[in-house]
């Protein structure tokens, strides 16, 4: 078993105030320790919130982020704080989704990353946003994201 170097982390194991916006949030990474092995890391945020940039009303989504590391893992507390920083941030669903994915790609330079954002209906229309960096590495197991299509009462 490899020991992960956490000496450069500023948030793990300490009390950290919630960032007020995504630009203020600090994403951190740790070495993977499993170079040469392709595997999928999944983060699920079933209660993601942001604000509508027009009305200021809350928007809710179920996020699923999958990635294949290439040397780096996102530190989960920093990811949690980053995602929570959208709580008071006004942006359209598409912008929130793509901005989250691009920040992670910039930080980690993963072999592959995808995000599925399953937004709850606004005005009677659910908006689902999907993005990925390209084709996943051959041979990795990619489970279904497991979020059913919105059906309302039906």
Curated annotation (Swiss-Prot):
Pathway: tRNA modification; tRNA-queuosine biosynthesis. Signal peptide: none annotated. Its EC number is 1.7.1.13. Pfam families: QueF (PF14489). InterPro entries: GTP-CH-I_C/QueF, NADPH_dep_7-cyano-7-deazaG_red, QueF, QueF_type1. It is found in: Cytoplasm. Keywords: Cytoplasm, NADP, Oxidoreductase, Queuosine biosynthesis. It catalyses: 7-aminomethyl-7-carbaguanine + 2 NADP(+) = 7-cyano-7-deazaguanine + 2 NADPH + 3 H(+). GO terms for molecular function: preQ1 synthase activity. The active site is at residues 52, 59. It comes from the Bacteria. One of its GO terms (cellular component) is cytoplasm. Substrate binds at residues 74-76, 93-94. One of its GO terms (biological process) is tRNA modification. Catalyzes the NADPH-dependent reduction of 7-cyano-7-deazaguanine (preQ0) to 7-aminomethyl-7-deazaguanine (preQ1). Belongs to the GTP cyclohydrolase I family. QueF type 1 subfamily. This is NADPH-dependent 7-cyano-7-deazaguanine reductase.
């Amino acid at each position: 078993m490899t020991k992960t170097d956490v000496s450069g982390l500023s948030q793990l194991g300490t009390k950290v105030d919630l960032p007020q916006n995504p630009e203020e949030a600090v994403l951190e990474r740790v070495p993977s320790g499993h170079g040469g092995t392709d595997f999928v890391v999944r983060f699920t945020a079933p209660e993601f919130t942001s604000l509508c940039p027009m009305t200021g009303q809350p928007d809710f989504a179920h996020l699923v982020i999958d990635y294949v590391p290439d040397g780096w893992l996102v530190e989960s507390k920093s990811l949690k704080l980053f995602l929570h920083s959208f709580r008071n941030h006004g942006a359209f669903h598409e912008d929130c989704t793509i901005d989250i994915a691009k920040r992670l790609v910039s930080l980690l330079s993963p072999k592959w990353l995808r995000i599925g954002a399953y937004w709850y209906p606004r005005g009677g229309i659910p908006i689902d946003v999907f993005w990925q960096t390209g084709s996943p590495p051959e041979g990795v197991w990619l489970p279904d994201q497991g979020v059913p299509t919105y059906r309302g009462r039906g």
